[in-house]
Amino acid sequence: MSQDMVTVLTKRILESVQYYENFSIPIGVSNRHIHVSREDLDILYGEGYALTHKSELGQPGQFAANETVTLQGPKGTFKHVRILGPVRKQSQVEISKTDSFRLGIKAPITLSGHLQGTPGITLIGPKGTVELSCGVIIAARHIH
């Protein structure tokens, strides 16, 4: 291989390395949170209540709301759990494995929206309480 060829290849390799050094993929870790249905939001916050935006999420159209609820499980409680908007068809609570031990709930690791056969929990808001019969999950790793 000639010296000119080595120089050209070296230059191309260095350009590729520099490109990927500046390349980034945003990664987020989601803390415990809840998605609520219209019906449950009406009970928790009052009839016709509209969630207020705290911050936008990476997923287009989704946001963290200023509103929070208390999660009450058989063994423990978490206060100030953030509601994510907009409202959904069915309420869903996403927690970590550690949270599940503290709450006393055997939540399965599954994809968001896969709620059949999942345990329930009590949601406490400023205007009322909702007893979910199902909907508590540990979200499986996923990419948005």
What are these regions (language model features)?
Residues 1-21:
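Short, low-complexity, charged amphipathic interaction modules
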Residues 26-74, 79-126, 130-144:
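Short beta-strand-centered segments at strand-helix junctions
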